[in-house]
Regions:
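Acidic, low-complexity, intrinsically disordered interaction modules
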Residues: 46-79
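A broad "ordered helical/assembly scaffold" signature
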Residues: 4-17, 57, 62, 89-92, ...
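Negatively charged, low-complexity tracts enriched in Asp/Glu with abundant Ser/Thr
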Residues: 1-53
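Polybasic, proline/glycine-rich intrinsically disordered low-complexity segments
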Residues: 67-104
Length: 104
C-alpha cells in the first residue's frame, strides 16, 4: 500500500501547493488528465468535477466537490482530503464546465 499512498499524497501536495514546474499551471495539468466528469445540478449550477489523473496502476481520481484524492490498486483503496486548492483546479474545471454546459 505504501506506493499507492505515496502516489496519492503526491497528487494532494500538487493541489495544495500549486504546480511545481516553472511556467506550468492548472491548464497544463488539465491537458494531461485522462477523464473529467462534471457534477452539475438540475438548475445548471456547477458543483464540482471528478478527474482521472492516473490509470493502470494505480488509478487515481480527484474529486473537487468533496476535495478528495482517491487511489485504487487491485483491492486496496487510499483516500485523502485536501484542504487548499492552490493549483486552482476547482475554478479551472468550473470555467470549463461553464463553457461546455452554460452553467451559472
Amino acid at each position: 500500500m505504501s506506493n499507492l499512498k505515496e502516489q496519492v499524497q503526491a497528487v494532494v501536495e500538487l493541489i495544495e501547493n500549486g504546480y511545481a514546474l516553472p511556467g506550468m499551471g492548472v491548464h497544463e495539468y488539465l491537458e494531461d488528465v485522462l477523464e473529467i466528469g462534471y457534477q452539475i445540478s438540475g438548475d445548471k449550477r456547477y458543483l464540482g468535477a471528478r478527474l482521472l489523473v492516473a490509470f493502470g496502476g494505480p488509478n487515481i481520481w480527484v474529486d473537487t466537490r468533496t476535495q478528495t484524492v482517491e487511489g485504487y490498486w487491485w483491492g486496496e483503496k487510499f483516500e485523502v482530503y485536501y484542504h487548499t486548492d492552490e493549483l486552482g483546479l476547482h475554478e479551472a474545471c468550473e470555467e470549463l464546465a461553464s463553457s461546455l454546459f452554460d452553467c451559472v
